[in-house]
Amino acid sequence: MLRRQVFAFCLVSLFAFNSCQKEDTSSKSPEPNPSGSVVTNVDQATLLQLVNDTRQSGCICGSTVMPPVAPVTWNDQLASAALVHSNDMNSKNYFSHTGSNGSSAGDRITAAGYTWKAYGENIAKGHPTEKAVIDGWLTSEGHCKNIMSPFMKEMGAARVGSYWTQELGSR
């Protein structure tokens, strides 16, 4: 009899636990993580491919013809800096290159452990996919020039909620 009661209690507890969990219904992209360890809520391989396809073919940024440049590689330190900034913008509901604590992109990149010679940052809000955010950045002259800069050798990016951050850099 006691065994039945314990079994019934376990069964009811299991059902109650599962029914109290809220399923995440937000639209998140898959997270292939080619280099490793930073969970960025973006499809890193897709972002890297879209950026490098553009860099390798060249493009027009505003009225400036940008010739083909070498591809960039993924960097987890840059991705970590991007994640910090996207999280900050999302949690404090603002949109700016300046962090809520007054930090610049260079400050955040340095804090993530990346020793840079040059860096650039792109931010966006509201784009539903990796392709949409890259397309948006490429239609903005300044963002496009960041992506196409021959001085940029590595990148990392992250999305939190509807806030995207891309960090580009070279050491």
Question: What spans do the regions from the language model cover?
Answer:
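Hydrophobic alpha-helical segments, especially transmembrane helices
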Residues: 4-6, 56, 144
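Disulfide-bonded cysteines in secreted/extracellular proteins and peptides
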Residues: 20, 59-61, 144
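A short alpha-helix/helix-coil micro-patch that ends at or immediately precedes a cysteine
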Residues: 32-91
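Bacterial Sec-dependent N-terminal signal peptides
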Residues: 13-42
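Short, surface-exposed glycine/acidic/tryptophan-bearing loops
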Residues: 76-129, 147
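Disulfide-stabilized extracellular recognition modules
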Residues: 116, 120-171
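Sec-dependent bacterial lipoprotein signal peptides
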Residues: 1-18
